[in-house]
Amino acid sequence: MEYITMQEAWDQIEAIPGYARKKSSLLKVREFLGLLGEPNREFQVIHVAGTNGKGSVCAFLTSMIREAKIPCGTFVSPHLVDIRERFLINGEIVPEPEFIRAFLEVQHACEIWERRGEPHPTYFEFLFYMGLCIFRNAGVRVLVLETGMGGTYDVTNVVENPLVSVITSISIDHTAFLGSTIPEIAAHKAGIIKSRRPVVYDDSSSEAAAVIFAKAKEMKSEGFPVTPDEVRRGIRPCLVKSPDPVDPGVAGHQEMSFSYRGEEILFEIPFAAPYQLMNAALAVRALEVSGLPVAPEQAAEGVKKAKWPARMEEISTGVYLDGAHNADGIRAFLDAACRLKELRKPDHVRILFAVSADKDHQRMLREIAERLKPDLWILSKMESHRTLSVEDLEAAAEKLRAKYGEETEYRVSRDVKHAVKELLGLH
């Protein structure tokens, strides 16, 4: 058998182009999966699409299913540190030997594929194929599957009979691929709805909900909207104490009463961000609709134990990490951050900000400055070819300084690792 190290496999994957001149059709995707023995037919699937909240919904679902001891695989993106984070088996990162085994399986299929004159799969396609092999090899029964981008033409949409489709919050993002309006983007997301298969969706946006409702009707699928009012009615006033003995008064958790299998269940949400209430509600409703044998107490315990890094994650006392990447994500981050600022009343608010060049960074910076009012900004490059340049970061710092005054300090860093050390050194 061929031998390859984890690092060698990872390096080869990272060398795969992220986009192809021509996107693989789902027909071609199914043809490629045939070379792998059609692993896509091995699981019961919960398919999750949306702009924001997909990963959190997947995390809640995974934790609840795991609590019921149902063998569960989870495919999510992107990874933060280790590429294996994209593939979870019963909530745990796939072991290196299983990662390498799947890599070699897909690599072998690619060699056959290219000999036929077909183009090599894109980065995301390759990882999706790997995920299906990983989960098949692990004997997974239920797959929680997050889309990459959009829905209709996403490689994950080869799923034919999901237990339930879930569509989270929809906002403006990836406009070059999905369109520039909410209805256009919602139409792409709604593409995961399958004939006569139920769909659970966030009803916060009337524009998006109308598109999803129409698509569900077209597909003869039953729709299960979760409304903001339904979530708000369930919120319970609480100040759940943090496990941190030095600062025990932090509202690190939230409580929400929500219907599950005909019972009103009190769910403890282990995240400070208000938007996680809707994400938890979507996951609970989707689990109920899926018909999976998860008891109410298992669902409640699963939500309580859910983990999802970089979503207002407190990595050290008073230090939060958040992966907001678009306008709605920034607003959700600010809702949570301002809430915590009000509760904790810190002496200083310092922020490290890094962003991709294709994002509306000026708008993001303006909203953060006006609402959170940081004392110190560190604007940094990321370790990515998509990062905003140092020159653009410096220009952004100058604009902030001109508008919000000299009393706020601005720094620009060429190295995000150095920037993190600098920030933590001040804490």
Write out the residue ranges for each language-model feature.
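Hydrophobic alpha-helical packing residues
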Residues: 61-69, 135, 397-400
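Short, surface-exposed connector motifs at secondary-structure boundaries
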Residues: 191-199, 340-349, 373-376, 403-406, ...
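Acidic, Mg2+-coordinating active-site environments of NTP-dependent enzymes
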Residues: 114-115, 139-146, 162-267, 280-297
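C-terminal helical cap/extension that packs against the catalytic core
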Residues: 205-224, 365-427
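Nucleotide phosphate-binding/pyrophosphate-handling subdomain across enzymes
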Residues: 142-145, 153-166, 170-171, 261-376
